[in-house]
Amino acid sequence: MIKSEFVYLVLKDVFSIKGRTYNNRKHIQSSVGWLSKAQDEGVDGGVSAWYGIFSGWSEPYIETTGYIISTFLETYHLLKDKIYLDRAIKMADFLVSVQLEIGGYKTYLNSNNKKDLPTIFNTGQDLIGMVDIYNETGNIKYLQSLTKAADFLCMNINKDGAWKKYSYDGKSHSYDSRVSYALIKAYKATKNKKYKQVALLGLNWAMRQQQLNGWFKNAQLPPPNPIVPYTHTISYTIEGILCSGILLNDSKLINSSKKAADAILDYYSEKGFIPGTFDSKWSSDDKYTCVTGDAQISVVWSILYLLTGQSKYLSASEKVNEYLKSLNSVDSKNNNIRGSMPGSYPIYGDLIRGQGYCRLSLINWAVKFFTDAILLNELIKTNSSIKYIGK
């Protein structure tokens, strides 16, 4: 049965009615409020993956629960409210409870046999949050968990830097650069040089997928997704390389990520719109946006602003964020909707072509990256220190 609240969301997009926007802090509070609701709808501290038009609240998504930890820790330091730290700790404890003996975290919560296997990419995203919660609390159980996860990732990389075993489809992907980024964070936390060595192996593989124009091969999700990558996975790739480059002070990595980020900025500057996917020529005829990807590229541009001081990056980030704020349903009276973000805009994607990303769903990773984007803008605006996002 269709959830009645989606009728409003669909009609709003049909008639291009945008929501009212507010200051950054109001949107941050609204978004982490929705993520808190998603956590309460989950199990044992895990964050529900989505609120769907037919299904309502889903079971917790182990992968995204991991990197939502970092968002809550950053929010805790900005808003000075311990509830966000407490919730981050509950997420971390949930991850510890679903970690397998071989070191990776479960891919699915309610899994059996084959589905009990971990996934390289998902474990990497959980490792990001586990490093951050360890750095925040100093709790030895988180150190033990992150060490097991990092060791698992190191044991399963190929000599050429590709991660194929325990991948979604037996193939390595450019966006595994965010797995390398997680290992760099683990290296910084533990001083285990093996983590850095393996991370660089993976990063070099990812950079070998880059074309001269900055586009990355092998950045698409497995079928039945499009044969060209969503901005979501393109941004994962850029983020992983950029943040690793910053942590290692490696100009080669930074320049690689910057080339791709600049290509998207050029497109956005000309079109005023970021399409859901890009082909190898940085072109697209998509009629929808991938909201998660929009938020992620905003994060990338803010980080590049902090790195270079070039105002074009901050200006583009702020402009994208203003559009994203209008999708945030801050004024909704329904607490399943208020503070959420859709998978696509319009929420139904491209109905004629049957295209879109997570259509007719409100997804926790879109909210996570939107919150990160707004947090960065607010921290830059107030000249405050950034503790976790991109660190």
Regions found by a protein language model. Name each.
Residues M1-K391:
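Glycan-recognition and catalytic cores of secretory/periplasmic carbohydrate-active enzymes
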